């Protein structure tokens, strides 16, 4: 055996798994198709928002939250209507995982992260607040905790731990190693086979080449697949698109780099993995094309307040709960029900100055760079620098 565990994917999930495995004394090989510059995957580009329940940040804002309320909200949003009580049902393990995660978010999650050095912006955001009755979709209270340092700040402690383990000889990071097959022996996954891609100096987030330079095979008694989803492959998205939302949009923009291609899902299924709930996807409707793109079709999500008018393609105003940040999937269906795949956001410079922000680490350099002076500058008149750049 080449290692105790092989981890496929060097994004946040892969790094967390690897760090914890190393702390448990395991030898780990991490393989990833991208170059070292992309260590951390798509999490690097995120706003760094984390779901926490009953946190000190909430209490300072006099937000009353609990595990019971969070679980009620989760049930109202997820539904879990696909045989959740049957171990063979699609929602059985989904519900079990969700309950464990809510308990984690209301329990040790914040203390664990704080112990690793993660800190939070003192203002808690209210994402997906719903707009229905209390037992319907959405968060009853604000739970969106912004990491001080955004996505890179979430990654930092795990990158540090994995690099230290690599230096100590407990981890091998093999970049430009693309897995094409999971090796199955006597019904168990015992390794990976794939292609070594040519060296690439592609910058983080930009597309790297897929030119082969060789083959590889590695073996281990355990293999963890942490390879990410299908967000950058519009054809895979369309193939899994649910009928309940209507016809998939003809034109889409992309919130993640090109390497988020979903390849390992089909590869894992071929090896015997069970894929469930493929049609339960999450697509933001408040996206606009990035004027300065990093990856193909680069889209950025607007984080607006309530004052702008949101109109369909024919100029008719959307009704409740189709407001920005309230119920993303309901709004997506409302847009597609019009027969068009776009909508209009009518606003003013004054509203933009007071209410608009953009999602993503690169669109919030003050928070990402942990610059208190720049953050305080948000209180000054006018939009933030990134918002102004979009307006210009």
Each model region followed by its residue ranges:
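N-terminal Rossmann-like FAD-binding beta1-loop-alpha1 element of flavoenzymes
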Residues: 5-30
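Short, well-ordered coil/turn residues at beta-beta hairpins
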Residues: 9, 195, 220, 226-227, ...
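Conserved Rossmann-like nucleotide-cofactor binding loop
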Residues: 13, 36, 316
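Glycine-rich FAD pyrophosphate-binding loop
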Residues: 23-44
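N-terminal glycine-rich dinucleotide-binding loop that anchors FAD/FMN and/or NAD(P) in oxidoreductases
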Residues: 44-75
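Conserved redox-cofactor binding core of oxidoreductases
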Residues: 92-216, 234-235, 288-289
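Glycine-rich loop(s) and the adjacent beta-strand/alpha-helix scaffold that form part
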Residues: 199-291
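An anion/pyrophosphate-binding glycine-rich loop and adjacent beta-alpha core
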Residues: 265, 271-392
């Amino acid at each position: 055996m080449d290692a105790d565990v092989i981890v496929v994917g060097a994004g946040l999930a892969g790094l967390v798994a690897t760090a914890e495995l190393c702390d448990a004394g395991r030898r780990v090989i991490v393989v990833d198709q991208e170059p070292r510059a992309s260590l951390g995957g798509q999490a690097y580009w995120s706003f760094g928002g984390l779901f926490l329940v009953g946190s000190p940040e909430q209490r300072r804002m006099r937000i009353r939250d609990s595990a019971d309320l969070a679980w009620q909200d989760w049930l109202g949003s997820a539904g879990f209507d696909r045989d959740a009580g049957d171990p063979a049902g699609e929602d059985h393990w989904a519900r079990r995982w969700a309950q464990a995660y809510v308990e984690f978010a209301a329990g040790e999650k914040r203390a664990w992260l704080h112990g690793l050095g993660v800190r939070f912006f003192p203002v808690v955001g209210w994402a997906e607040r719903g707009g229905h009755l209390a037992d319907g979709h959405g968060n009853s209270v604000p739970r969106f905790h912004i990491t001080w340092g955004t996505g890179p700040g979430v990654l930092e402690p795990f990158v540090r731990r994995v690099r230290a383990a690599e230096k100590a000889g407990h981890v091998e990071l093999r970049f430009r190693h693309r897995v094409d097959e999971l090796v199955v022996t006597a019904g168990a996954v015992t390794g990976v086979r794939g292609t070594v891609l040519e060296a690439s100096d592609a910058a983080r987030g930009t597309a790297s080449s897929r030119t082969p330079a060789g083959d590889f095979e590695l073996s281990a008694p355990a293999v963890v697949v942490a390879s990410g989803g299908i967000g950058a492959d519009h054809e895979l998205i369309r193939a899994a698109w649910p009928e309940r939302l209507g016809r998939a949009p003809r034109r889409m923009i992309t919130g993640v780099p090109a390497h988020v291609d979903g390849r390992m899902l089909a590869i894992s299924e071929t090896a015997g993995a069970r894929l469930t709930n493929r049609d339960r996807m999450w697509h933001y409707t408040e996206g606009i094309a990035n004027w300065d793109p990093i990856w193909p079709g680069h889209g950025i999500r607007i984080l607006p307040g309530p004052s702008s008018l949101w109109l369909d393609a024919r100029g008719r105003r959307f009704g409740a709960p189709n407001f920005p940040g309230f119920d993303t999937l309901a709004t997506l269906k409302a847009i597609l029900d019009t027969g068009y795949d776009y909508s209009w956001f009518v606003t003013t410079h004054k509203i933009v100055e007071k209410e608009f922000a953009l999602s993503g680490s690169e669109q919030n350099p003050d928070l990402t760079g942990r610059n208190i002076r720049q953050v305080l500058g948000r209180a000054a008149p006018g939009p933030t620098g990134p918002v102004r750049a979009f307006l210009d």
